[in-house]
């Protein structure tokens, strides 16, 4: 994967508070990308990458929207630099999508019947004891 070019502009105030966590998640992402995939299905090798991407984006989202711990300028800097996924955050702000795992799970064009992923089905509508696992990202149910 090519190295992402970061802007030459200095980060806004407050960056030094969130930088260690983002660096730690970047390190986890690099480990997940280089992890051997022998013995796994093709789709299973991408699941850790999706989880870390979700974790990074949720971290930025919670800091800005829930805890109000970072400024709008720093939030926009994180989105512009690729630390958070703005499309996923836009979905999290909508009712019913607060716990969405990834954007692939709501794209209907990727399925045979034009429906959402199995992880978007509420647990109350599934059979009791049935364990589900999303083929896209490995989610076990993000609809509630």
Curated annotation (Swiss-Prot):
The keyword Transferase does not apply. Residues 59-67 are annotated as: Interaction with AR. The keyword Cytoplasm does not apply. Keywords: Acetylation, mRNA processing, mRNA splicing, Nucleus, Spliceosome, Transcription, Transcription regulation. It is found in: Nucleus. One of its GO terms (molecular function) is nuclear receptor binding. This is Protein BUD31 homolog. It comes from Homo sapiens (Human). The gene is BUD31.
């Amino acid at each position: 994967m090519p190295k992402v070019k970061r802007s030459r502009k200095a980060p806004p105030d407050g960056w030094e508070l969130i930088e260690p966590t983002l660096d730690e998640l970047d390190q986890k992402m690099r480990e997940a990308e280089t992890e051997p995939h022998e013995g796994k299905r093709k789709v299973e090798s991408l699941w850790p990458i999706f989880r870390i991407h979700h974790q990074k984006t949720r971290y930025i989202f919670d800091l800005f929207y829930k805890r109000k711990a970072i400024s709008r300028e720093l939030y926009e800097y994180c989105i512009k630099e690729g630390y958070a996924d703005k499309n996923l955050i836009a979905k999290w702000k909508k009712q019913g999508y607060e716990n969405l795992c990834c954007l692939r799970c709501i794209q209907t064009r990727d399925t045979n019947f034009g429906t959402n992923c199995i992880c978007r089905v509420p647990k109350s509508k599934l059979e009791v004891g049935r364990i589900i696992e999303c083929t896209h990202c490995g989610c076990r149910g993000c609809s509630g």
